[in-house]
């Protein structure tokens, strides 16, 4: 788990960057919330990305890992979803998942093209229903922002559904798995609602 002083340093850096941007751009409240969320996300993700990319290079799996990571992170940026409370555990699981899944898929024949497309469309339905999955870590009060994120999540899922036709079988399978991973992180765990505070 991260030391308190390390977390404090990240919070201070985030606040300073946000204050500088806010001072120069005079953002509206909704825009300011998105910028702050973006800064926090980037500062939390960078260490995980570095570790993941190093492992991918060691296993000679950089392109598949980047495809998996990119498709997941783009969609998750709109769908939101649960987070682990421990940064250390999150870093370990991130590296294992982003590197392990593409590495294992290379030893399979992948999923047939038409079946991949059907799976993508089937996954788009619950992703559209439950996005954005608001949590304690990422609360969203604005209904207009929720609607905008929901629409973007649906459009992104549909784009990936067609994009998987343009790549190799293994890369197409990786895109499908990225949608599946997003789905597992936004599907409700308690009470039938995806935006409950209990769904960390």
Curated annotation (Swiss-Prot):
Pfam families: AgrB. InterPro entries: AgrB. One of its GO terms (molecular function) is peptidase activity. It comes from Lactiplantibacillus plantarum (strain ATCC BAA-793 / NCIMB 8826 / WCFS1) (Lactobacillus plantarum). This is Putative AgrB-like protein. GO terms for biological process: proteolysis; quorum sensing. GO terms for cellular component: plasma membrane. The chain crosses the membrane at residues 49-69, 88-108, 114-134, 148-168, 171-191. Keywords: Cell membrane, Hydrolase, Membrane, Protease, Quorum sensing, Transmembrane, Transmembrane helix. Its EC number is 3.4.-.-. May be involved in the proteolytic processing of a quorum sensing system signal molecule precursor. The keyword Hydrolase applies. It is found in: Cell membrane. Belongs to the AgrB family. It is a multi-pass membrane protein. It is an enzyme of class 3 (hydrolase). Disulfide bonds: none annotated.
């Amino acid at each position: 788990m991260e030391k308190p002083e390390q977390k404090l340093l990240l919070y201070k850096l985030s606040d300073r960057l946000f204050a500088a941007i806010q001072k120069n751009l005079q953002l509206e409240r909704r825009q300011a919330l998105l910028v702050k969320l973006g800064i926090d996300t980037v500062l939390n993700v960078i260490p995980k990305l570095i570790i993941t990319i190093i492992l991918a290079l060691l296993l000679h799996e950089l392109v598949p890992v980047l495809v998996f990571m990119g498709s997941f992170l783009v969609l998750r940026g709109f769908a939101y979803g649960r987070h682990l409370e421990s940064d250390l555990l999150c870093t370990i699981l991130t590296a294992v998942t982003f590197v392990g899944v593409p590495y294992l898929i290379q030893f399979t024949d992948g999923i047939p093209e038409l079946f991949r497309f059907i799976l993508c469309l089937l996954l788009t339905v619950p992703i559209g229903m439950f996005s954005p999955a608001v949590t304690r870590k990422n609360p969203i009060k604005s209904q207009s922002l929720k609607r905008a994120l929901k629409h973007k999540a649906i459009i992104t899922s549909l784009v990936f559904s067609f994009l998987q036709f343009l790549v190799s079988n293994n890369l197409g399978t990786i895109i499908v798995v990225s949608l599946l991973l997003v789905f597992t992180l936004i599907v409700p765990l308690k009470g039938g609602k995806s935006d409950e505070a209990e769904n960390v």
